């Protein structure tokens, strides 16, 4: 029995990145031997065990054979006869197909170290195409390591393109797709993930609504970058630079989907794109079974982001309607994320990334003014039920009118 560290633990150590999770492969062992040593079985499809002392994961060396469509269509074979090289060849990328023993000796049959030093993401073998989820994984790795200069090998990108065009991506479950998408969006350069998906023709299958934005012009006076797709990537990039949560990043990606449906004869103007985008945002949310908080913010940002940009010009009554749409009195954080998403939208324009965005603080001030209206005096006056709600609305409107009369600092 021999035990090796494999995959990300080896890759990240060689890159000088802190290793957080360690996966190990066991060569020359049986399930019975692992159980006899006290390991706890956890794998449903193939033999994976946990060390009860520290929770580390150990998997028996295995091979796999394609048996059906999608990422789940595989037959696995684990036995003491499976070699380390046979186990490593089933992995996605050469940089993930290296192993290391306890003495630090590297096993690298597929030249992962060479590709690591050259900053190349390259598939190990043609078997890469047997798992469509790998298209998303490679795009995610491209986003994760973009700051180190990693790029996808041309032949790997071509294989990803063939896989995208084969229809195999349609076999992915919403849950597995969203897991990869959400992880990728939380990388430091999530815009690279979207760009790689577009480069390999996967974006038009996974998110055709986003793919449709590329090549759609906007007025140069407001958008020096002109292209709506380029703008969307820039907005997402700004959200990542400002360390925003997944809810904000998802909303930034989807906020302008309506612009992809603007009639050609109306370009480059996009009148009512906010309203037209709502059904598209809803469709993407449903396609990937997106968590409710991400769904809700994406829809609200899509509908109201131009309100945010015009915040200083809005009437008090319109501000009140905006605050009520966000349920700002019970969910203030959601309105805060809206203000941030609007700012990221404004910063995601070529040459305007550092421009001050006073609208965000103005929106925060409006929310504060409305929230500070006390209910107790109205209760003391005898208001209750629907009448209390109307009285509260009137007082909040007064507060917003007073707020608008204050000088903008």
UniProtKB/Swiss-Prot annotation:
CDD domains: HDc, NT_ClassII-CCAase. Mg(2+) binds at residues 21, 23. Its EC number is 2.7.7.72, 3.1.3.-, 3.1.4.-. Keywords: ATP-binding, Hydrolase, Magnesium, Metal-binding, Multifunctional enzyme, Nickel, Nucleotide-binding, Nucleotidyltransferase, RNA repair, RNA-binding, Transferase, tRNA processing. InterPro entries: CCA_bact, HD/PDEase_dom, HD_domain, NT_sf, PolA_pol_head_dom, PolyA_RNA-bd, tRNA_CCA-adding_enzyme. Signal peptide: none annotated. It holds the Pfam family PolyA_pol_RNAbd. Magnesium is required for nucleotidyltransferase activity. The keyword Lipoprotein does not apply. ATP binds at residues 8, 11, 91, 137, 140. SMART domains: HDc. Residues 228-329 form the HD domain. A single active site specifically recognizes both ATP and CTP and is responsible for their addition. Belongs to the tRNA nucleotidyltransferase/poly(A) polymerase family. Bacterial CCA-adding enzyme type 1 subfamily. Monomer. Can also form homodimers and oligomers. Catalyzes the addition and repair of the essential 3'-terminal CCA sequence in tRNAs without using a nucleic acid template. Adds these three nucleotides in the order of C, C, and A to the tRNA nucleotide-73, using CTP and ATP as substrates and producing inorganic pyrophosphate. tRNA 3'-terminal CCA addition is required both for tRNA processing and repair. Also involved in tRNA surveillance by mediating tandem CCA addition to generate a CCACCA at the 3' terminus of unstable tRNAs. While stable tRNAs receive only 3'-terminal CCA, unstable tRNAs are marked with CCACCA and rapidly degraded. This is Multifunctional CCA protein. It comes from Pseudomonas fluorescens (strain SBW25).
